Amino acid sequence: MRAGRCAAALLLLLLSGAGRAIGSEDIVVGCGGFVKSDVEINYSLIEIKLYTKHGTLKYQTDCAPNNGYFMIPLYDKGDFILKIEPPLGWSFEPTNVELRVDGVSDICTKGGDINFLFTGFSVNGKVLSKGQPLGPAGVQVSLRSTGADSKIQSTVTQPGGKFAFFKVLPGDYEILATHPTWALKEASTTVRVTNSNANAAGPLIVAGYNVSGSVRSDGEPMKGVKFLLFSSLVNKEDVLGCNVSPVSGFQPPDESLVYLCYAVSKEDGSFSFYSLPSGGYTVVPFYRGERITFDVAPSRLDFTVEHDSLRIEPVFHVMGFSVTGRVLNGPDGEGVPEAVVTLNNQIKVKTKADGSFRLENITTGTYTIHAQKEHLYFEMVTIKIAPNTPQLADLIATGFSICGQIAIVRSPDTIKQMSKYRVVLSSQDKDKALLTVDSDAHGSFCFKAKPGAYKVQVVVPEAETRAGLMLKPQVFPLTVTNRPVMDVAFVQFLASVSGKVSCLDTCGDLLVTLQSLSRQGEKRSLQLSGKVNSMTFTFDKVLPGRYKISIMHEDWCWRNKSLEVEVLEDDVSAVEFRQTGYMLRCALSHAITLEFHQDGNGPENVGIYNLSRGVNRFCLSKPGVYKVTPRSCHRFEQAFYTYDTSSPSILTLTAIRHHVLGTIITDKMMDVTVTIKSSIDSEPALVLGPLKSAQELRREQQLAEIETRRQEREKNGKEEGEEGRARPPGQEMVDELQGPFSYDFSYWARSGEKITVTPSSKELLFYPPSMEATVSGESCPGKLIEIHGKAGLFLEGQIHPELEGVEIVISEKGASSPLITVFTDDKGAYSVGPLHSDLEYTVNSQKEGYVLTAVEGTVGDFKAYALAGVSFEIKAEDDQPLPGVLLSLSGGVFRSNLLTQDNGILTFSNLSPGQYYFKPMMKEFRFEPSSQMIEVQEGQNLRITITGFRTAYSCYGTVSSLNGEPEQGVAVEAVGQKDCSIYGEDTVTDEEGKFRLRGLLPGCMYHVQLKAEGNDHIERALPHHRVIEVGNNDVDDVNIIVFRQINQFDLSGNVITSSEYLSTLWVKLYKSESLDNPIQTVSLGQSLFFHFPPLLRDGENYVVLLDTTLPRSQYDYVLPQVSFTAVGYHKHITLVFSPTRKLPEQDIAQGSYIALPLTLLLLLAGYNHDKLIPLLLQLTSRLQGVRALGQAASDSSGPEDMKRQTKKQKTRRT
């Protein structure tokens, strides 16, 4: 059975194990799951292994052969890696799973599955070089299903040509090889994958590899050099893409070489051989000019093609005459006579009548050639002249002159005529300017242009354009072939504008204006007058530009009250103003349709306007009084309004209610009632219904129409005759009613009103049960409500054979809790309903002692099977019951993992008939049988005996502190010694400090010690390790004492100073990043020693500062400071404080400095007493103020001064 079809919940009991009960160590956590595959695989070849995160194997097991189920017991918490180890080439996802088993939230403790999905086998093959045992790297190889176009996988070959595809499921496949440059002889093969890895049916073959090189002469590439290929090992038939014909004039240098083919160098000097098989070759260059054969170096080159493309090195070089040419006026054109040809700006020759010229004494090299001729233009050409180029390429004229004239007849009055204009040359099919020139003072201009179709335009300045200056033509098209164009001309243009006015009645007096849109202030008017309904007008001598033509009469409606015309290159005519009616203005609160007709007139005067919100203007075709009726989804203050064209005013319409539409759609025609509740208290609840569906109303209309026609036939029966009266009335039939059925309703709501619509029916369920809608009133609400009603759903089913009391659970699909629970009757039947028909439901059944499965092809029917049972008796080799054994039983969709109790017996009941696989597991024991497949029949009870044999033993002990307190969470390990050095076990102490190391092999010596990692809180252990020898019994009382890390740092120090200063001293402790706030302060009192309270051993940086209350006005001193890091356990520091008392003469000295400038000022006062006396008094006052401030600052020095010193001095670290 395929494990991919297995899906059931894992039943895992966490019970205490056998032997000594020492707490959580004996708790068994089972980590299990499935190896799943959608194809048949041999599960017995797959192993599941459990490793520690350091790579130590903890446990391994195989899979159930029937469904791939596996189970691994865990006796310790910690970090593990669960790996699947299948045969080489088999692929699974994932390949390993990292586990962090904490006994609470991990996947094993929660009973979750850990599944490995088989993704396929491997397919291996080779790509070989033709005739070789190896092949190339870098060939693209793809795998696709036979007959399919899309590839499944692709890879590239490795050195030697090997390739492999992984994750390939059974089937028939094609393997195809491709390479962008190499030719493939065998590009495809096949492979069939069944139930194991597969090899390609045959190798893929590369026919050959491309080989290339290059040839130059004086650093320039050479074309036309032949390269002949020879080989004594490769057959000519195996070489592809090469000219095999013999080369005329070539003599082979070595008769032992076999000629294969040749290649010729291209324009860039490169040559290549398309496909050469692996092997040794010789290439010989051969180059003959028009009359001479040149030497090429090297003259011969041997090379070997292996399994890759090859670039031949070194580059071949051609080692060591008059030339002629022509100058033409175009491709295949005529020769240009008297043209000057210059070579490297030094040698000059003139062309003959046919345009030909000759250059003498030219050596191989690169030259610059240029031709010159009036009104013809040539590009400078750089060419390589070599013996193989005796005839130079033609020098072809690339451009010709285009010349013309601009003629201004009269300049506009508002501007001054310019002396020159800009002229633009552009391509006829593009507007982008190619060339731009300025005309001279006489209006002449010239361009230089290549052959082609062009257009010439004169750029008139914007000021002159606004003034009305225009040249004609605007665009001068021309074609340059092989000679200059000299007849381009532009002249000024003036125009006239004319039109007519059409009135509904007599026109009377009208005013028509012509105003320039491009020139401010230019405006002309024409006064029209007449008793006719049509008049004409004309404006003459109009300068080019944009104009606005307007007609003045505000109370009339015009088709166009004003028109914009643009005078370009022609006169403007056919301008028409036509009166359309009389103006009506209307102010609306909402966009509506307005229907009106004229009182006293027939229906032909009815008009309809679609108007927008705000003030609208529209025209009435005739004068008089009109009745105006609004038609919209809004209800207004009046049902209709009147308007008189003889008394024009703004007609105002304001909406007070808005039409809300709704629909109830049902799949069945039923009674439907709608209740509408308003958020406005003054509006009562409105009950509509029972409603009639649109289908019912349409049917009633059809019946009414049939009845009307029947009555008409009876009325006219006498005229129709007896035959007509005898026509049966049943010939006309109404349409049958078919769902879905629509029940429409409406409601007139106020602006901002919120309504709640609730439908009701006896047999329908509505979705949603009710709807709310808020009417803004800004626009037509339209259909705001749409509710669907559906008939209730009834679920019915039957148990086969008939079985009473089966629990039927109905749940909504995806819901976590059941919806309805019922039991079958004595006939085994049940019925549930009505339910919401638009929801999906799941129907489950259960009954103790039975397996119930859904009957295929039915919904709600189940088939019942009586369950079977299996009992396992697990004993030790001394026939005593063996508790604590984890027994895994799996089969089909069932699996269970249980621990044996003190009696060693496990019973599995309620099993479905089928095959089951069991496996007993317990560390330190092996079992017979170790695993087995069993067949369980329906209703059968089996009894199976299993014997366990002890193969390893345990070590028990405790970890405690020096005072005997247990240490929890300490990692302990047993490390094998000597011949057992590859073995090891580890565990973690429980809350009582106890540990159990399982799986210690008899005859081995172990060191029991603390693990290096995971014990950061432990400083050391006593002893460092305990030595044990394992015999045929468990090892007890292996106890270890541990010492925790001390996290305290002691700080002490002393001060060297005179005892008279001790009472003024304080020692302050700061963190180095915060020198403004001390964290601790101690006073020395009468002692030279100090001690701070213990600090944390946190590795932080600290600063110790000495502070004093001695006034700086009387003492000079430096406050010492020491910085340190809280590393280790203790720090002692020494501070030196040596103050000195200031002398009184210092004050006199300060006064002498002040007296000197005072004396000088007094001497100057005799000369400038009127100016210096006020200045002297001011200076004296300021100096005294400065002195007083200095004295005050000296007296108040202390901690602040200490901080300044701290910033100045470098910190002394100890």
Swiss-Prot record:
Recorded protein name is: BOS complex subunit NOMO1
Q: Which organism is it from?
A: Mus musculus (Mouse)
A Pfam family per the record: NOMO_5th
Q: Can you tell which superkingdom this protein's organism belongs to? A: Eukaryota
Q: Which GO terms describe its cellular component?
A: endoplasmic reticulum membrane; multi-pass translocon complex
Coiled-coil annotation reads: 692-720
Kindly report every residue range on the membrane side named Cytoplasmic: 1168-1214
Q: Could you describe the subunit structure of this protein? A: Component of the back of Sec61 (BOS) complex, composed of NCLN/Nicalin, NOMO (NOMO1, NOMO2 or NOMO3) and TMEM147. The BOS complex is part of the multi-pass translocon (MPT) complex, composed of three subcomplexes, the GEL complex (composed of RAB5IF/OPTI and TMCO1), the BOS complex (composed of NCLN/Nicalin, NOMO and TMEM147) and the PAT complex (composed of WDR83OS/Asterix and CCDC47). The MPT complex associates with the SEC61 complex.
Q: Which Gene3D superfamilies does the annotation name?
A: Carboxypeptidase-like, regulatory domain (2.60.40.1120)
Extracellular topological intervals: 24-1150
Q: Which gene encodes it?
A: Nomo1
Composition bias, Basic and acidic residues: 708-726
List of residues that carry Phosphoserine: S1196, S1197
Q: What is the recorded function of this protein according to its Swiss-Prot or TrEMBL entry?
A: Component of the multi-pass translocon (MPT) complex that mediates insertion of multi-pass membrane proteins into the lipid bilayer of membranes. The MPT complex takes over after the SEC61 complex: following membrane insertion of the first few transmembrane segments of proteins by the SEC61 complex, the MPT complex occludes the lateral gate of the SEC61 complex to promote insertion of subsequent transmembrane regions.
